[in-house]
């Protein structure tokens, strides 16, 4: 009888530990913090435009992106940094804010910009291999 109670207590303790682990992992995914940097973009007229960006380097950071964010302040963005030039593909799953994306080559030159629709599962692809992608509030590149 004592052995059965001991085994049940061990199982209960393992269940409690597993529950705490699952809750902690879920919460840490929600509270992912991105490193921030100040960058500048030089437009075609030679005007220098400052922007504060969050850096997305890891798969986890890239997967999270702006998902769930309802407010992205003007003058800010998220810079996705890839290890090599490749054709990139983005979507807006669980992203409620309209965004524009710039596809940027390894020399830092913006090759193209595209607008993206909130919550869309349709992919937005770069037309050529690039190293970076910069997401900003929709319309920011036109200003």
Regions found by a protein language model. Give the residues of each.
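Compact, glycine-rich, soluble single-domain proteins
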Residues: 29-143
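C-terminal motif of bacterial Sec signal peptides marking the signal peptidase cleavage site
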Residues: 25-26
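Bacterial N-terminal signal peptides that target proteins for export
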Residues: 2-13
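Hydrophobic helical h-region of N-terminal Sec-dependent signal peptides
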Residues: 13-22
């Amino acid at each position: 009888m004592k052995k059965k109670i001991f085994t049940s207590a061990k199982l209960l303790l393992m269940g409690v530990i597993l529950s705490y682990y699952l809750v902690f992992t879920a919460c840490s995914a929600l509270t992912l913090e991105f490193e921030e940097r100040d960058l500048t973009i030089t437009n075609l007229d030679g005007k220098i435009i400052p922007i504060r960006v969050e850096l997305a380097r890891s798969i986890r950071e890239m997967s999270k992106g702006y998902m769930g964010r309802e407010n992205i302040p003007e003058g800010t963005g998220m810079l996705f940094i890839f290890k090599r030039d490749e054709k990139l593909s983005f979507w807006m799953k669980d992203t409620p804010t309209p965004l524009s994306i710039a596809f940027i080559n390894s020399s830092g030159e913006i090759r193209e910009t595209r607008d993206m629709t909130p919550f869309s599962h349709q992919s937005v692809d770069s037309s050529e291999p690039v190293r970076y992608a910069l997401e900003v509030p929709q319309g920011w590149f036109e200003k």
